[in-house]
Amino acid sequence: MKAIIGKKVGMSQIFDENGKVIPVTVIEAGPCTVVQKKTAEKEGYAAVQLGYEDVPERKLTKPEMGHLNKAGVAPKKYLREFDLENAAELNVGDIVKADTFKEGDFVDVTGTSKGHGYQGVVKRWNAGRTPMSHGGGPVHRHAGSMGSTTDPSRIFKGKVGAGQMGCDQVTIQNLDIVKVDPELNLIAVRGAVPGPKGGLVLIKSTVKTHRIKHADSGISNNPQKASGRNPQKASARTK
């Protein structure tokens, strides 16, 4: 089990050995410093606290500086805790870099989705409009009926409505690492990652054991079966 803190750089694309385009998200992962180590004997569970991104001391509170000074670590802007099975292998002051992961690893990436402010039900929940004619007005983008009257005299849970959109913690599971650049501390993961450019993300080894099949994973290298169908059987069906 491995983990690291990073920032989203943006999206790009990488070509594999077959010339196929792989959309990737580039993440600046680490370097992170182990600030605290928790053990099952003392705290009841094994975990480590990582610090990321240096910051001036004046930006932190006295309790935060006391916590970092106790560990002998320079001031850090972000502190995050990870439950790791191999927490015993890490010690306070150790540096965790991008080369902790390798190409082919599957990870879960957690970030904060982009905030869109106060939005209506059409944009927020993809609700449908009322008819533009035949008495559908005067308001066409409202939420519609909220429920019954005397019975049940309430709005059922799950009813969509207007409100704050985005700015939620989102975790994308089972993203495979396509490329790792240890010199620049960059990790390229397949697909999209929540949050804007520069947003904080947490990368951790996936908790799921199954693997997601990609769109091109079932395509055969045999040109006669490139479409996934047997041409002989296909021709027999047309006769």
Question: Residue spans of the language-model regions?
Answer:
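Extended basic (Lys/Arg/His-rich) segments that typically form rRNA-contacting surfaces
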Residues: 1-239
